């Protein structure tokens, strides 16, 4: 039988999450505080005894690890620093130290979870990450990203390859 878990099972519907977020500040303050992120990951397991637990993090830790500035606008969601020169997108390099807190969270959750509880890591798809990196925010139609992809397939392909490489490393880091 596959484990039962819910997308976004940790989060704002839980009063204990809201209290911890108020204490810590913003969303990214929770994500990059391994103690707090582990606590948020474990909250729904304690409350509902789900079969599976999903890592509390965000897909945008990947572009952050690639050097883009990341922040959240209240009421509007995530933002990434604009990439003015798309020719340099594929030159972004991974800084694994920007993922250390996430890996610490994984270790803390693994140590605290009951043996019978499945633990799921995750990462965003390269296309989804690319849309945020190019647009600097979420986009309903991804028009800016599609324009870039069609206008310069080679450069866009390099961007996708760079995102794919760090995503593979990131997922392997979650497993290790």
Tell me what each language-model feature is:
Residues 12, 68, 125:
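Gly/Ser/Thr-rich helix-start
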Residues 64-67, 109:
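Pocket-flanking alpha-helical
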Residues 71-173:
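Active-site-proximal, glycine-rich beta->alpha crossover segments in alpha/beta enzymes
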Residues 1-65:
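N-terminal basic, low-complexity leaders that serve as flexible interaction/assembly modules and, when applicable
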Residues 46, 175-176:
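Non-catalytic positions within long, well-ordered alpha-helices that form the structural scaffold/packing
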